[in-house]
Amino acid sequence: MIDILLLGCGGGMPMPNRFLSATLINYRGRKILVDCGEGTQVSMRISNTGFKSIDIICITHIHGDHIVGLPGLLGTIGNSGRTEPITIIGPEGIRETVEKLRVIANWLPYEINIIENPKDTFKLFDGNINLDVDISVLELDHSSPCIGYCFYFKRQPKFDVEKAEKNKVPKILWNRLQRNEENIVLDGALYTNDMVTGEERKGIKVSIITDTRPIKNIIEFINDSDYFICEGTYGEDKDLPKAIKNKHMTFREAADLALKGNVKKLLLTHFGTAMNEPEEYLNNANEVFDKTIIGFDRYKTTLNFNED
């Protein structure tokens, strides 16, 4: 299962009841953080998530409301006792930005690996840590270089006892091969994981899009997502001219992407400071896509793999 925690749902500047953009994804006890706006640490402390197990930090773009909380968080992660490397992914300029932000966190007990402006789908390995997740990115349309993220969490195929016995695979290797250790040599014989497993099973797809106009490429990128987290800077339809000018989206535009992308659920976030009660405008999204949820700080949901 995958736990998603919306640490902050605000855009622009923090408010008394709304921290800035940050989303925490927990899978198998390891964590991926998407954006790190002001208040991220506080929200994590309130939620009792811990800091040590954050392996990947994905930054959508280099605007303060999405990254200003990063140096403090890096220091806190260091104080938590972490020594394993952390990977930071972001758009063009992320390397220079992280280096400058580290002026106030210049010594850390772990390495930082930076992936700047990635283009292809990739998997991250970090020592013995394998999140078993494919990460894809998409260039968005904002006032600074901005990327969206898609996370595909793979599911282990079912173990096939009959197949394993037919292939004469030693029982001491069954568990290792099922857990995707591809090749094992024992007593001069080669054993592969397809000798003990059945067909692949569907994983879980989570897409996060924020700070952009609703460009067509988003539809294919988010297609068939189990969970689509999207910005909704403006709730009212009449604010469309502002959304166009500032390169953001209205609730209705986000819902239209969800509908065309055939996603299962839409979670709206990144609410502008002029919007005190986002729930008042939920109908503007529901008229287009009726599986829309209005996010709030520390909103939490769990996604389960289908039983098959």
Swiss-Prot record:
Its EC number is 3.1.26.11. The active site is at residue 65. It is an enzyme of class 3 (hydrolase). It catalyses: Endonucleolytic cleavage of RNA, removing extra 3' nucleotides from tRNA precursor, generating 3' termini of tRNAs. A 3'-hydroxy group is left at the tRNA terminus and a 5'-phosphoryl group is left at the trailer molecule. It holds the Pfam family Lactamase_B. Zn(2+) 2 binds at residues 65-66, 211, 270. Its cofactor is Zn(2+). Binds 2 Zn(2+) ions. Keywords: Endonuclease, Hydrolase, Metal-binding, Nuclease, tRNA processing, Zinc. CDD domains: RNaseZ_ZiPD-like_MBL-fold (cd07717). Zinc phosphodiesterase, which displays some tRNA 3'-processing endonuclease activity. Probably involved in tRNA maturation, by removing a 3'-trailer from precursor tRNA. Homodimer. Belongs to the RNase Z family. HAMAP family: RNase_Z_BN. This is Ribonuclease Z.
